[in-house]
Swiss-Prot record:
One of its GO terms (biological process) is meiotic cell cycle. This is Aurora kinase C. Belongs to the protein kinase superfamily. Ser/Thr protein kinase family. Aurora subfamily. The lineage of its organism: Eukaryota, Metazoa, Chordata, Craniata, Vertebrata. It catalyses: L-seryl-[protein] + ATP = O-phospho-L-seryl-[protein] + ADP + H(+); L-threonyl-[protein] + ATP = O-phospho-L-threonyl-[protein] + ADP + H(+). ATP binds at residues 22-30, 45. The keyword Nucleus applies. Okadaic acid, an inhibitor of protein phosphatase 1 (PP1), protein phosphatase 2A (PP2A) and protein phosphatase 5 (PP5), increases AURKC activity. AURKC is also stabilized through its interaction with INCENP, which also acts as an activator. Changing residue 175 to A: Impairs kinase activity. Keywords: ATP-binding, Cell cycle, Cell division, Centromere, Chromosome, Cytoplasm, Cytoskeleton, Kinase, Meiosis, Mitosis, Nucleotide-binding, Nucleus, Phosphoprotein, Serine/threonine-protein kinase, Transferase. GO terms for cellular component: chromosome; chromosome, centromeric region; condensed chromosome; cytoplasm; meiotic spindle midzone; midbody; nucleus; spindle midzone.
């Protein structure tokens, strides 16, 4: 029985057996944990209130909780519930035993066509669900993609996400290598920023580094603004076609998520397995 947001129980830290650390960030740590009551395994994200207040991130955290708690999709990490005490905030998250996609990429340096196409298909399906719910992720990158028991992708870290209001957004956020041109130019943007990120991710998974990576941030900015990237010969023609149709300067010229899911290279190489 998962500790769902729909249950009215108020949790405390005493409801959990705490296991090994799974990761650490600027504002706290994530631990493997088990509910004493029914032995349900979770990841417990422990955040320090003082750090969050010092950085003025209360609003961002509230937004992350509000967004992630309402998303239920097999390729999105579940946020089951949350609680807090005088000094800490605890997020009860789905445990993703495969760890970060970033670590898989580091281990193998680059991924093959099948693995990459499968990830792109899973990610595009999850983002279709997000966009239908008027949520833009804005920070898709290997560090924010976790892996389930069978290697399936789970989008995590909705800290930068936004519920899209009717007015298009202008704040710059996300990771430098993955920033789209419209964010660098501080122009209004829409959900097509996530399509740019899918293109960058697909390139990085197949090549082992992002397409606009440079020795200085100003050079990276320049290359993004000019959409200046080249494919190594190792990248298959079908993948080149997909990536080049996603990494377009004008958001309206990028493929839609539906077109990514129908793209011949994705359909031919994806080995996505759906649950029965």
């Amino acid at each position: 029985m998962e500790p769902s947001t729909s249950t009215r129980k108020h949790f405390t830290i005493n409801d959990f057996e705490i296991g090994r650390p799974l990761g650490r960030g600027k504002f706290g740590r994530v631990y493997l944990a088990r509910l004493k009551e029914n032995h349900f395994i979770v990841a417990l994200k422990v955040l320090f209130k003082s750090e969050i207040e010092k950085e003025g991130l209360e609003h961002q955290l509230r937004r992350e909780v509000e967004i992630q708690a309402h998303l239920q999709h097999r390729n999105i990490l579940r946020l089951y519930n949350y609680f807090y005490d005088d000094t800490r905030i605890y997020l009860i998250l789905e445990y993703a035993p495969g760890g970060e996609l970033y670590k898989e990429l580091q281990r193998h340096q680059k991924l093959d066509q099948q693995r990459t196409a499968t990830i792109i298909q899973e990610l595009s399906d999850a983002l279709t669900y997000c966009h239908e719910k008027k949520v833009i992720h804005r920070d898709i990158k290997p560090e924010n993609l976790l892996l389930g028991l069978n290697g399936e992708v789970k989008i995590s870290d909705f800290g930068w996400s936004v519920h899209t209001p009717s007015l298009r957004r202008k704040t710059m956020c996300g990771t430098l290598d993955y920033l789209p041109p419209e964010m660098i130019a501080q122009k209004p943007y829409n959900e097509m920023v996530d399509l740019w990120c899918i293109g960058v991710l697909c390139y990085e998974l197949l090549v082992g580094k992002p397409p606009f990576e440079s020795s200085t941030s100003s050079e990276t900015y320049r290359r993004i603004r000019q959409v200046d990237f080249k494919f190594p010969s190792s990248v298959p023609a079908g993948a080149q076609d997909l990536i080049s149709k996603l990494l377009r300067y004008h958001p309206s010229e990028r493929l839609s998520l539906a077109q990514v899911l129908k793209h011949p290279w994705v359909r031919e190489h994806s080995r996505r397995v759906l649950p029965c």
